[in-house]
Amino acid sequence: MTNGYIGSYTKKNGKGIYRFELNENQSRIDLLETGFELEASTYLLRNNEVLYGINKEGEQCGVASLKIDDNGELHLLNKCLSSKAGTGCYVSISEDKRYLFEAVYGAGIIRMYELNTHTGEIIRLIQELAHDFPTGTHERQDHPHAHYINQTPDGKYVAVTDLGADRIVTYKFDDNGFEFYKESLFKDSDGTRHIEFHDNGKFAYVVHELSNTVSVAEYNDGKFEELERHLTIPENFDGDTKLAAVRLSHDQQFLYVSNRGHDSIAIFKVLDNGQHLELVTITESGGQFPRDFNIASSDDLLVCAHEQGDSVVTVFERNKETGKITLCDNTRVASEGVCVIF
């Protein structure tokens, strides 16, 4: 049995953090329950036996740390709610486990926290930095919108996507906070959202929410150079849709991207050691607004959360040879679910 967690909005019926048990032998979820009620816990991160979740209380915003026990149940360690500048949308941890990074979409800012490397607790907010870059012409790009922050494969920087400014910004970082390093621009109105790095550290898959495209980019010393791009929806689809999550299979052979509105998952074959992508197929996600999904460590199953409609959680069996997925379970619900982790 594999334990997993789903983060959610708490605007309507969402509970914050759900816990589920994935039965990999039967390709289904045997249990899905409220794991911990945490307001606005829209993104989660697991670091061994500690889980971090976006959180807010009133006007105070930040991140909470929780201990995962032997049964997969969650227990609060502490919270660091040191800002009034808005709730985050992404969290990640540095390789040395000393720092936690947070991206805040609404305010267009990034945050950096100090961590206790022994307990995983959050010690303090080190810095909150606002983006101030020229924005695109799309109506959603009225100001900068930091959407992702994570350490680069070389370990030297953090890379931040800005959906409002159509770019990736890299920063040096230390005990004092962030220092601007380089920026890589993409097309106007792309709405650059997330990055998934290939294990070789040379190539990155950059997804753009507004243009519904994925770019293959070569990464080198804080800079991203686009090599090619692919549409993640059918060319003849003219409905309202927005790209959401991106994940690589653990064997690095296939890339998966979810589309909210078209309600699908696009599957690409990874070619030439990560340098190229080739569309395999686009499969219905089995629900409405597939905000996030994740792939079990065995590479056999994919679990997808749907933010809208019935908020069904779908489980797909995955063919390791073709990359294709087949729906096998849609009996569980996680209201307002927007993040899936194992």
From Swiss-Prot:
MF terms (GO), sorted A to Z: 6-phosphogluconolactonase activity
GO cellular component: cytosol
Pfam families: Lactonase
Signal peptide start-end: none
SUPFAM superfamilies linked: Nitrous oxide reductase, N-terminal domain
Cysteines joined through disulfide linkages: none
Protein family per UniProt: Belongs to the cycloisomerase 2 family.
Protein name: Uncharacterized protein SAS1845
Organism: Staphylococcus aureus (strain MSSA476)
